[in-house]
Regions:
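Non-catalytic, conserved peripheral segments adjacent to functional cores
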Residues: 2-91, 99, 104-107, 111-113
Length: 113
């Protein structure tokens, strides 16, 4: 199956909708303490810079590795990657600016807040 067909199947199977920050998502769990979503970025998409108010953990599921851009001050940033070198999780602390970009055709991750 081609990458385009995999992306289409993931969106349809999980009933994903466009996310305001870019990409597609579906909420799969929510209670008073935690929320978890599946989040999908294609190669032409990115999750735009935004500042989070709660600590968020990203979990890699499939596709190409994902670059995570973070900044404490909104000016200097660093890049981490999940989905390669046995690194499948990354936590972004509350108050941090961050953005996401797939390194290939697509990246499917989970986000837990």
């Amino acid at each position: 199956m081609s990458d385009k067909n995999i992306v289409k199947a993931l969106i349809e199977e999980h009933k994903m909708t466009p996310h305001p920050e870019g990409g597609h998502y579906v909420e799969i769990f929510r209670n008073d303490d935690v929320t978890h979503i599946y989040f999908l970025l294609e190669e032409h998409e990115n999750s735009h810079w935004h500042r989070i108010t709660k600590t968020e953990t990203l979990h890699f599921y499939s596709g190409s590795p994902l670059n995570i851009y973070t900044s404490k001050d909104g000016e200097e940033f660093k890049v981490d990657e999940i989905g390669s070198n046995n690194n499948f999780m990354h936590t972004v602390e509350k108050g941090t600016w961050f953005a996401l970009k797939s390194t290939g055709a697509y990246s499917l991750i989970g986000c837990t807040v």
